[in-house]
Regions:
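Short hydrophobic alpha-helices and adjacent helix-cap/hinge residues
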Residues: 1-187
Length: 187
C-alpha cells in the first residue's frame, strides 16, 4: 500500500487541481496522501457505499463488513475536501423484476469474483434475500471457488426455476496480479 502511494506521488509530483477516485478501495488506499502532500485537494469519490472498512487490514482481508470492523463513510471523510457519489445496489428491485418476469424462479444464482466490492455485494444480496425473499434459495458462484469452465457447466445445467444475476467475474492469471476478464484470449 505504501508503495502504491509512493508511486502516485512520484507519477504526479505536482499536486492536481482535483482527483476523481472510483470505488472505496482506491480512496482508502490513497487517503493518506490527502493528509499530507495533497491536503485540501478536492476529491470526488464515485461508487461509494454507506460503510467502509475501518482499516486497510479489513479491506485487504476481504471479510464481510460488520458494525465492528467498518465505519460510516461520513466519519472516514470528515477531515477531507471530498464529495461522495453513492452507488445504490438495487438488489431488491432486481429481484422483484426477476420474480415479475419469471414467477417460477425458486433460486437465484449470483455470479461474482474475489474483489472487495464483490464481497460487499454478496453480503448485501444475502441480507436482502433473507429479509425480503426468504422463500428464494441463493447460490453464490464466485471466481475464488470455481473455475470459469465450472461456471459455464453450472449455468448450462440451470432450468427456468433459476434466475441469474451477473455481477463480476475477473480472474487472475499467473503471478503478475493483472486481472483479465476470463473470456479474453490470452497470448
Amino acid at each position: 500500500v505504501r508503495q502504491a502511494q509512493a508511486n502516485i506521488l512520484q507519477t504526479y509530483p505536482t499536486p492536481p487541481k482535483a482527483v476523481i477516485i472510483v470505488g472505496d478501495p482506491g480512496w482508502l488506499v490513497s487517503a493518506p496522501i490527502f493528509d499530507g502532500p495533497w491536503k485540501d485537494i478536492p476529491v470526488i469519490l464515485c461508487y461509494s457505499r454507506k460503510r467502509v472498512p475501518a482499516d486497510l487490514q479489513t479491506l485487504l482481508s476481504k471479510i464481510p463488513l460488520t458494525e465492528e470492523n467498518s465505519i460510516p463513510i461520513e466519519e472516514f471523510n470528515k477531515n477531507y475536501n471530498i464529495t461522495v457519489l453513492e452507488q445504490p445496489y438495487y438488489i431488491k428491485q432486481t429481484l422483484e423484476l426477476i420474480r415479475q418476469l419469471q414467477p417460477e424462479v425458486k433460486r437465484i444464482a449470483f455470479i461474482s469474483d474475489d474483489r472487495y466490492i464483490s464481497v460487499v455485494t454478496r453480503q448485501a444480496i444475502k441480507e436482502v434475500m433473507q429479509k425480503d425473499f426468504p422463500n428464494l434459495q441463493l447460490e453464490l458462484l464466485s471466481s475464488e471457488q470455481i473455475s470459469t469452465e465450472e461456471l459455464l457447466d453450472t449455468l448450462t445445467s440451470y432450468k427456468k426455476t433459476t434466475g441469474v444475476i451477473y455481477y463480476a467475474w475477473l480472474r487472475q492469471y499467473g503471478s503478475n496480479k493483472n486481472y483479465y476478464l476470463s473470456d479474453h484470449l490470452k497470448k
